[in-house]
Amino acid sequence: MKALTKTDFNFPGQKSVYHGKVRDVYNINGEKLVMVATDRISAFDVVLPEGIPYKGQMLNQIAAKFLDATTDICPNWKMATPDPMVTVGVLCEGFPVEMIVRGYLCGSAWRTYKSGVREICGVKLPDGMRENEKFPEPIVTPTTKAEMGLHDEDISKEEILKQGLATPEEYETLEKYTLALFKRGTEIAAERGLILVDTKYEFGKHNGTIYLMDEIHTPDSSRYFYSDGYQERFEKGEPQKQLSKEFVREWLMENGFQGKDGQKVPEMTPAIVQSISDRYIELFENITGEKFVKEDTSNIAERIEKNVMNFLSK
């Protein structure tokens, strides 16, 4: 089992390449983006030292499926998926914020709430809430998009408008799309016996139109609970059975790592890497309702290059 942790392609018309935490994005002629979902994994804004076999394929295929399932809600950037790990799409000018939407109080929002804070991103929260409790209505809690190595910061709607990161009309559209996409994602998850707990969306503009970009409803951008037993676990104050990257974060925390300065990433043994890969496959199959078909990983970079070249030459 091989994992793709770095890419160095040179496609026809390539103007630039951006290496993100997980994806490598190639700009073709200033018109299209070739986005490669690598097998890198990040947590606490740090890229971990080992790649996770098949993770890129899973992320790319889940995102493609949900982009196709939401085109009636808003336009999105996807044009094609010429390789299981690649999406080619329209080049958009991204808004410098991530639209995070939460249906339940958990993760970083719970950690903030537990510390006594009752307002997140300008959204006031009532007293007396418990971990993993459902909000009466989903809340939107945006963050800034940090440069590599820096942490994303919470930001309120007021601050976004004040800093000119979006106009009032644009922000209204972003929020409307965010809530509608989350509603659709929640409905699809429910059909599979899952709860979509929280997720994030990224948007950009192309020719004056706002497009949904990047990934959607993947285990890297979302948190899912199993609905079966949710209520019982909640009432007993027990941890929920979840499908997300949270299990990676928990493993890191148990081993003394939270992304803080001076902390060392614990060794990722082959068994840990295998278990993370297995969890991702479990999530893929649960959320799509389809069997995961492992692609040939004998020479991933060569396969991607061939498939993308074929697509671009059309």
Swiss-Prot record:
EC supergroup of this enzyme: ligase
Pathway: Purine metabolism; IMP biosynthesis via de novo pathway; 5-amino-1-(5-phospho-D-ribosyl)imidazole-4-carboxamide from 5-amino-1-(5-phospho-D-ribosyl)imidazole-4-carboxylate: step 1/2
Reaction(s) the record says it catalyses: 5-amino-1-(5-phospho-D-ribosyl)imidazole-4-carboxylate + L-aspartate + ATP = (2S)-2-[5-amino-1-(5-phospho-beta-D-ribosyl)imidazole-4-carboxamido]succinate + ADP + phosphate + 2 H(+)
The UniProt record lists the keyword Nucleotide-binding: yes
GO molecular function: ATP binding; phosphoribosylaminoimidazolesuccinocarboxamide synthase activity
Keywords of the record: ATP-binding, Ligase, Nucleotide-binding, Purine biosynthesis
Any matching Pfam family: SAICAR_synt
Gene Ontology process terms (BP): 'de novo' IMP biosynthetic process
Coiled coil: none
EC number: 6.3.2.6
Gene3D superfamilies recorded: ATP-grasp fold, B domain, Phosphorylase Kinase, domain 1
Listed NCBIfam families: PRK12607.1, PRK13961.1
Assigned protein family: Belongs to the SAICAR synthetase family.
Protein name stated in the entry: Phosphoribosylaminoimidazole-succinocarboxamide synthase
Gene name of the record: purC
